[in-house]
Amino acid sequence: MKSRRAGRVMWIALAVLLIPALLLLGALLLVSPGTPKPFLDAQGRPLTGSISEKSYVKINGIEQGMFIQGRSAHNPVLLYLHGGLPDHFLTDRYSTGLEDIFTVVWWEQRGSGLSYHPDMPPDTLNPEQLVSDTLALTDHLRARFGQDKIYLMGRSGGTFFGIQAAARAPQRYHAYIAVAQISNQLESERLAHRYMLERYKDEGNHKMAKRLEEAPVGDTVPLPDAYLRVRDVAMHELGVGTTRDMNSVFTDMFLASLLHRDYTLGEKIALWRGKLFSGSRLWNTQLSTDLTQKVKRLDIPVYFLHGVHDYTVSYPLAKAYFEHLEAPVKGFYTFKQSAHTPFFEEPDKMRQILRADVLTGTNGLADPQ
């Protein structure tokens, strides 16, 4: 009798555990069809001449994935280089309107998201390889869309190798567009640490202030693990991270990625596995490199777009880099209501700059110099 009762209790306990798990799995599968929605015309039919697809291309021996979206496949091609985490999923919340102007290629680079492979040799994930991949994908896009040149846009970590690709092969690009351009990232981290510590002290948040005081940022790489554990949490809490209105990596990034319908469930898992895989391998090189000494000139128009509230990548350091960078045409654009991602936070201003200045190779809307 006791054994039967114990058996029933065990089955009830298993049901209590399994049923919610199965319901959650079913819900995740339901919101993970993995197919981008088409652009629609006024009658609700697929828009003629538009493109909205998930595409895979073998680049330098590794199959790499990307989303390609545009209301007209005849528009100029814009190759977008993301930072540490592919951010196409954030377009669910933040409409950029970039696809109205360009055929946008949201490439998920080697080791990240759609291009994460667990068996990929770690030593192939380095900035030089990413520059080579960028140039190879550029040539593929030029051939596919029949365009002699395309536009190159990098954000945050993507600017680290993006500006190097633009310097190496200017003949392939109309212009280089930098959103939160990295310059001297180790100094940027010191400035961020100082700012966040002062903010928490001013606000009376002794717990977070103590965590930062116990994790100083010095002159050596790698940075302390204790600082890296608190960094993203603090930046989002203080409104100086991805966007000013994000206050939690978990709710605003992780949960948002789980709800993104363009990924399958497996691809959503790969998104975060890739972040763990690729983050530190690229991060330490970025920290130990002073780009202001590595790339001093570009032979194409250059546009720096930066949120004044950005402490993920320093606004004043980017501005100082811009002032010394040589280019035939250049413009620096301050986004006063933005942190790290102006095209999510101030999309109207971003589109105005792209149409009026970038597409025409001018800088009439740039900050006064």
PLM segments and residue spans:
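Catalytic histidine-centered segment of alpha/beta-hydrolase-like enzymes
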Residues: 338-347, 351
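Glycine-rich "HGGG/HGxG" loop immediately N-terminal to the catalytic nucleophile
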Residues: 88-89, 111-125
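Conserved alpha/beta-hydrolase
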Residues: 98-117
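Short beta-strand/loop motif that positions the catalytic acidic residue
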Residues: 298, 304-306, 310
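Conserved alpha/beta-hydrolase "acid-adjacent" motif
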Residues: 311-317
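A catalytic-pocket lid/entrance helix-loop region that shapes and gates access to the active site
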Residues: 168-219
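Alpha/beta-hydrolase
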Residues: 206-293, 300
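Conserved acidic catalytic loop of the alpha/beta-hydrolase fold
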Residues: 129-149
